[in-house]
Amino acid sequence: MSVKSTVEQLSPTRVRINVEVPFEELKPDFDRAYKALAKQVRIPGFRPGKAPAKLLEARLGRGAILEQVVNDVLPARYSEAVTTSEVKVIGQPDIEITKIEDGQEFAFSAEVDVRPEIALPDYADLEVTVDAFTIGDEDIEEQLNSLRQRFGTLTGVERPVQEGDFVSIDLSATVDGQEVPEASTTGLSHEVGSGQLIEGLDEALIGLSAGESKEFTSTLVAGEHAGKEAVITVTVQSVKERELPEADDEFAQLASEFDTLEELKADLRSRVERVKKVQQAGEIRDKVLEALLEKTEVPLPEKVVQAEIDAVLHDAVHGFDHDEAKLAEALEAQGSSRAEFDKDTKEAAEKSVKTQLLLDAIAEAEGTQVGQEELTERILFQAQRYGMAPEQFIQQVQQAGQLGAVFADVRRGKALAGVVGKVKVTDSEGNTVDTAEMFGEPAAEPEQADAAQAGDAEKAAADSE
């Protein structure tokens, strides 16, 4: 094919690709169009699919056929022009047909966002400080008590409700004197103090005994009356308290593979240390990313940012039957407003796009590769997170066309981990943090890698002599 294309740089993040297609190259496309139309159009005296081109033109008009050909060829010619021009496009193009002369010339232009050129900072110049962590006896006791609670037993009590009790309750609600059926339930189990149900419920329950009721006001967060203040009535059916087993060697044998309480505590200490290291690793990753974002200028493609904003808004109004007025009411009930929501959404979208572009640029510069094992590991993790079978999750991701997004996410995370190893990290007590234990050794620079490979080759040659 001899498609001619030129690129105009409209901004650091947007280009116009001008494409010219010689008309003679459209002959195969016209042939396909005639063949398809012949199967659709009934012309007396001809079997379906056998009517000649001239009759089809007479029946439909040359213009209609030309329009179909143009619509059919645009995607392929656009993709060809993108490949030839070597531009890194993002998102969908805005295409305009600029010239079409039957039998002579066909030309169009495509405006599209592109990945901007990004000047990356010297990672060795970056420094971040994270919280130091210690492991105290209170951490071990907290874990031990949590384990004891898992093996605790519930016993009915005849006294007023206290925090930590387990109650069976009935709930009903009214808005402006009208009952709200979807907010009513009976025999609901609830741990007092967990804060897992309606705001204000735990406070209302404290001090009630079985058979007693109490009214309180709260804001409904879901359903037809979301965002509205409701009068809630709670009735206590029963009260139970949790009795914990003694923390001794017998409990250690019951709750673990250890024979003594001291062995169990030592294991809990190791677990707490691992958890705190994971938390510190997360803080390191977040702060290194923030430092990169602060040090790097990243031009933002407007349409990509807008697409991110539109996606967030679509998800937000989905829970309100796509009624933006209801969304505004819910926001006001939470002490916010639609203006604040739009501002926060825009800022979050800009940061998200900037982060993706920056990490993609780092991955490109560092030659970050993603293996099949790493991709599979992420898919298994995501499937578990959503409570889905891996096969079902993969099928859903493929149907949604999101497998590339999963790959990109893994690559970005790997690229960021590579940068962390080159950044100076200290904790709040002034100690240097060994990031290699958390993120692995930093990858060698390309020049160093080449030199190492050359040295290995020389050594192998010497060994073979």
UniProtKB/Swiss-Prot annotation:
It comes from the Bacteria. Residues 456-465 have a biased composition (Basic and acidic residues). Residues 430-465 are annotated as: Disordered. The gene is tig. Its EC number is 5.2.1.8. GO terms for molecular function: peptidyl-prolyl cis-trans isomerase activity; protein folding chaperone; ribosome binding. Its main location: cytoplasm. Consists of 3 domains; the N-terminus binds the ribosome, the middle domain has PPIase activity, while the C-terminus has intrinsic chaperone activity on its own. Pfam families: FKBP_C, Trigger_C, Trigger_N. Involved in protein export. Acts as a chaperone by maintaining the newly synthesized protein in an open conformation. Functions as a peptidyl-prolyl cis-trans isomerase. This is Trigger factor. Residues 440-455 have a biased composition (Low complexity). Gene3D superfamilies: 3.10.50.40, Trigger factor ribosome-binding domain, Trigger factor, C-terminal domain. It catalyses: [protein]-peptidylproline (omega=180) = [protein]-peptidylproline (omega=0). Keywords: Cell cycle, Cell division, Chaperone, Cytoplasm, Isomerase, Rotamase. It comes from Nocardia farcinica (strain IFM 10152). GO terms for cellular component: cytoplasm. SUPFAM superfamilies: FKBP-like, Triger factor/SurA peptide-binding domain-like, Trigger factor ribosome-binding domain. PROSITE patterns: FKBP_PPIASE. It is found in: Cytoplasm. The keyword Methyltransferase does not apply. It is an enzyme of class 5 (isomerase). The keyword Cytoplasm applies. Residues 164-245 form the PPIase FKBP-type domain. Belongs to the FKBP-type PPIase family. Tig subfamily. GO terms for biological process: 'de novo' cotranslational protein folding; cell division; chaperone-mediated protein folding; protein transport; protein unfolding.
